[in-house]
Amino acid sequence: ASEGSTGVIVLGSHMTPPRKVSSTGVIVKVIAVAIDNVDRAMVRNVLRDAPSTPFVPGRSFCGRVVDCGLDVKRLRPGDLVFGLQDLRKCGALAEYIMVHQDVVAVAPEGRLVPEQIAALPATGVMVHQIVQNHCMVLPRGSRILVLNAHDMIGRLTMQEASRLGMVTVAQVPPSVPHAEALCRQNGAVEVLMGDPLWTINLLHESSFNL
């Protein structure tokens, strides 16, 4: 536990795997879990509050379906899936997790390893919200600036913006190796090497729609 925390982080095996599944539930044997800043913040908060019951963190995961409820039609045992557990529940850092069918989907196989697949849900949901709320209201050909385009959120945003016909300008720090090639592979038309603040100061805000 960190300084100032009253709880303790442990790796244990005292929790039994789920045996019964609800009609709309899915039991997944977890292969990989992606931890982001949201998960870290939740763990810090839980430790500070000294929980009376164990808290299992982890939201974004990849695994294989073990069992499905009677009303689950699009998944079956053996499917490789990825998903994002509800923030109020978490629990992915376990051998098994039971989730509602709506928070999992069949994962892409062949091009990504489970660790990479596990990172997609948390990032993908955020990018989906960005695209739905901002990009999709713009006409094709609109210019958008993506800051820190080399990270996962930036890459997915460039891919989706390019698919919608946006003209994407990417900013990446000079320290990122092969940055220009990486951004162009993900849909960038122009790549600017520099810090985010430098890039914003360099460009006039009227040059972009977003």
Residue spans for each PLM region:
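Mid-domain Rossmann-like dinucleotide-binding core that forms the NAD(H)/NADP(H) cofactor-binding site
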Residues: 120-197
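Extracellular beta-rich ligand/substrate-recognition surface
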Residues: 2-9
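Short amphipathic alpha-helix with an adjacent loop that forms part of the alpha/beta core around
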Residues: 196-209
